[in-house]
Amino acid sequence: MAGASDRTGVRRPRKAKKDPNAPKRALSSYMFFAKEKRVEIIAENPEIAKDVAAIGKMIGAAWNALSDEEKKPYERMSDEDRVRYEREKAEYAQRKV
């Protein structure tokens, strides 16, 4: 069987399914920026709405062009979301016990 598969015969352990009630992880400052910027980019360029790679490159370039001062609001959102996540994670752990 030429080119059949790369398998070595070693079984990998199955990944445990995530509990749908578990809290969502905190977003990074970049992710808050990307959510906001993606909407702007698609509104300005509807023809590239399906080109995820191009949009990602544009978002990355825009993020890198921001000064530290311009990134502060997104860092603040990230800090607030991290606090939310830690609180929800603690509540979730209490419910599981």
From Swiss-Prot:
The keyword DNA-binding applies. Keywords: DNA-binding, Nucleus. SUPFAM superfamilies: HMG-box. Residues 1-24 are annotated as: Disordered. It is found in: Nucleus. It holds the Pfam family HMG_box. InterPro entries: HMG_box_dom, HMG_box_dom_sf, HMGB. The keyword Nucleotide-binding does not apply. One of its GO terms (molecular function) is DNA binding. Residues 23-93 bind DNA. One of its GO terms (cellular component) is nucleus. This is High mobility group protein homolog NHP1. It comes from Babesia bovis.
